[in-house]
Amino acid sequence: MSFASFSDFLAMAHHGLYVWTAYAICLAVLVLNVAAPILARKRYLQQEARRLRRETEK
């Protein structure tokens, strides 16, 4: 599929809104799938560090 201009590429024969929204949602899901475990691990390590400090203070 070829387009006459970049504007035509973005419009995608009047399906651009659907196509680019689908790409954006897909990208958001991929980013969340990468970020969620990283943030969960960070939160877990912080909680464990707090727990360890509490136990050693007693």
Curated annotation (Swiss-Prot):
Pfam families for this protein: CcmD
Gene: ccmD
Top-level taxon of the source organism: Bacteria
Protein's job: Required for the export of heme to the periplasm for the biogenesis of c-type cytochromes.
Name used for this protein in its record: Heme exporter protein D
Compartments in which it is found: Cell inner membrane
Keywords: Cell inner membrane, Cell membrane, Cytochrome c-type biogenesis, Membrane, Transmembrane, Transmembrane helix, Transport
Lineage: Bacteria, Pseudomonadati, Pseudomonadota, Gammaproteobacteria, Pseudomonadales
NCBIfam families reported for this sequence: cytochro_ccmD (TIGR03141)
Record keyword Repeat present: no
GO cellular component, one term: plasma membrane
UniProt KW Cell wall biogenesis/degradation keyword: no
Membrane-topology descriptor: Single-pass membrane protein
InterPro entries xref list: Haem_export_protD_CcmD, Heme_exporter_D
Ranges that cross the membrane: 19-39
Family of the protein in this entry: Belongs to the CcmD/CycX/HelD family.
GO biological process, one term: heme transport
Organism: Pseudomonas fluorescens
